[in-house]
Amino acid sequence: MIKPISRRTVLRGTGAAIALPMLEIMTPRLRAGESSSDKVARMVCIYTPHGVRNSTWYPEKTGFGYTMSSTLDALSPMQDKVSILTGLCHPRMASNVGHAAAGRWLTGVNDGDRVLVDFASPNKAFSVDQLVANSIGTKTRWPSLQLSTEAGAGVPGRSRTLSFNARGLPLPSMNEPRAVFNRLFVPETANDRAAERVRYQRRQSLLDNVMSESKSLERRLGRADRERLGEFLASIREVELQLDRNQKWLDQPKPEVDTSDLQFAFKNRSEFLKVMYDLMFFSLQTDSTRVITFMSGVEVDMYKWGELGVNKDYHSLQHHNGNKVDMEKLSKVDKREADLLAGFLVRLNETAQEDSSMLDHTMVLYGSGMNNGVGFEDGKGSHSTRKLPTLLAGGGKLGIKQGQHLVYENDRTPLCNLHVTLMQSMGLERDHFVDGKERLTGLS
C-alpha cells in the first residue's frame, strides 16, 4: 500500500524549497548569434483580437495580381511579397470557443473545454513558435520573444500570450517597451554580471539538490503521480537549460542600436504598437532572436481607440450587431493596425540581407483566431472559428511563393497546414503539426 504524503511536501535545496505539484498521493486514498554569412530564417506571428470587418478587409479578386482592399491598402507597395489566405480554420475545433481563440491560434488545440481549464491538451498545446524556438533557439541570445499589449500569461480562456511550451504551459508576455529594450540592448556592468553569475550558481545548486531528492520520492509514488512528477522535473530541467544558456551569453556584449526614433513615452495604442514594432525590428536586425509572437490586442480588449475618434471599447465595438456606425469604426481600427504592420514590413524589406532583404528571410504571419462575421460577410459580431482572417508576408528566400490571394473552401483546410509550412521553411524536418498533415497548398 502506498502511504500518503503531506500536501505541504517540498523538495528542498540548500536554503530554499520548491513546492511540488498536486499529486494523488497527497490525498488519502481517495547572440547576437551567428555570422552574417549564415542562412538566417526568422518567424514572426502577430495576433489581432476579435477578427476583422470582413467586407473591407478581404480583397475582392483572387490569385496573382489581386487588388488590396481599402483596409490593407498600405501593403500594396509590397504586394508581391504578401499573400492573403482565405478560408483557413481548425476544422476539428468547435465552431465557437468564445475568447479562448488566442490560445488556440498557434497550437491547434481542439479537444473541447479542457483548454478553458488549464490551456493544455493531450497534444500538450505546443505552439508552433515554441517548437521552432526549441529547434533554433540556441543560435541567439533569446530563443524567442513574447510580446503583448498586456503582460503575463493571462487566465484560462483569456490568454495574454500566444506561446506555449512542450508541456502546454503558457510563456508570459512582456508589454513594457522600456523593459523590452533593456532586456535586449542595455549592457550589464561588470558588477551586475558578477552578481548574476553568483545567482546562477545558487540556482543551479538548488536545482541539483531538488533533482537528487526527487529520486527517492519517486519510489513512493503511484503511476499517475510519477507521470506528474516527471512533468514537474522536466520543467526543472528546462530551467537548468535556460540557466546554462544565460551563462553562455553573460559575457557576450549586447548589440547597440540607434534609439533616436524610439518613443518610449507613448500616449495611445497606435504609438504603443509603433514602438513595439520598432523593438521587434531591432531584435531581428541584431539577431537577438529569430522567433517572435506579438498580440496587438488581447481578446476582450477594452481599449478605446480615441486617436481614431472611437468612443467605444474595442470589445464592445466587435459586438456591433450589424450597426453600420460601429462597423465603420471597426474598419478604421483594422486599417490603423494594417498601416502599422505595413510600416514594420517596409522596414524589413528595405534592410539588406545577403542578396535580398530581411523580409525575404522572414515570415510574418498576421491574423486572428476568430471570425467576427458569418462566412465572409460582416454578420452581427460573432465568435466563429471558421474562415479566419490570415495574411502571410515575406519568406521568399525560404521557399514561400508570395503575391497571391488564395481561397480554401469548405472549412476543411487546417490552419495547421500553414504551421507545417512555417516549420519546414524554418528548417525543421517535420511533416505534420496537430491536424496539419502537409504544407499549405499554393504557397510553394
Model-derived segments and spans:
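Ligand-binding pockets and gating/stacking loops
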Residues: 1-444
